Regions:
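Residue-level signature of outer-membrane beta-barrel architecture
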Residues: 4, 26, 38-40, 44, ...
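Residues that define the transmembrane beta-barrel architecture of outer-membrane proteins
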Residues: 28-32, 48, 85-89, 103, ...
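Gram-negative outer-membrane beta-barrel transporters
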Residues: 49-60, 77-163, 192-194, 205
């Protein structure tokens, strides 16, 4: 498909303390996308569903609005990048297996390749460099095992190497990171209400990583929840 998009700066983009930029221009994007989807569903046997998808896209972005920490104090700054060319591929797969005694296994894979280069000014030192904090490679994997009203899930997220400033030099290189999470869920009927109890372990492997340089993410942590549907 082909479409154009228009994005006005948000109030925070313009006026957030020490970060906003009242001089920001609106962002405009021209998008081109070609994709394919395959979906197969069965009501019998082990293999119940198979889903495959792939998209190839190109975005021509003018006055792209971006924010990242800059300078010796790593203060957040919001600016326009005059022109950014974005090319990428998204691919995904999902499969559901059904076993006797209400056992179900679901798996999902997602992969993205993205090249987002600054083509504003050929005289800039970062001309045709990848823009900050956009990885070339990223992906995720999810596995969920269900039995009756119980469900156990595992998720893995990977983000490849990036650069934390506009110049793609060794000093600005940022290492890849990955993290694993697990979730246990139990549903209970109570009268007309449905209760859903959840227990999560996030950053299961206790990884030390930064999504943004010098902004460390939490180490292993736990979360418990209860949702009620009436």
């Amino acid at each position: 498909f082909y479409k154009t998009a228009y994005r006005m700066p948000t109030f925070n983009d313009l006026y957030y303390t020490d970060m906003g930029n009242p001089a920001l221009l609106p962002e405009t994007t021209t998008q081109y996308n070609v994709g394919a989807v395959y979906d197969r569903t069965r009501t019998e046997g082990i293999f119940r569903n198979l889903h495959l998808n792939a998209d190839v896209y190109y975005n021509d972005v003018r006055n792209k609005i971006v924010s990242w920490p800059q300078g010796p104090q790593f203060r957040w700054t919001t600016i326009n990048l005059g022109r950014v060319d974005i090319r990428g591929v998204d691919a995904g797969a999902a499969c559901t297996l059904a076993f006797p005694h209400e056992w179900t296994l679901t798996g999902k894979l997602q992969y993205t390749y993205q090249e987002a280069i600054d083509v504003t000014n050929p005289s800039d030192t970062y001309y045709r460099d990848q823009i900050p904090y956009i990885p070339w490679h990223s992906g995720s994997a999810i596995i969920a095992l269900s039995w009756g009203t119980w469900s156990l899930g595992y998720s893995f997220i990977y983000v490849g190497e990036r650069y934390n400033q506009q110049e793609n030099i060794i000093y600005n290189h940022t290492q890849p990171w990955y993290t694993s999470d697990m979730t246990l869920m139990k549903e209970i009927r109570w009268g007309k209400a449905r209760l859903r109890f959840t227990a999560e372990v996030n950053n299961l492997l206790d990884q030390d990583y930064d999504v943004i340089l010098n902004y460390p993410m939490p180490m292993r942590n736990y979360k418990f929840g209860l949702a009620v549907e009436l």
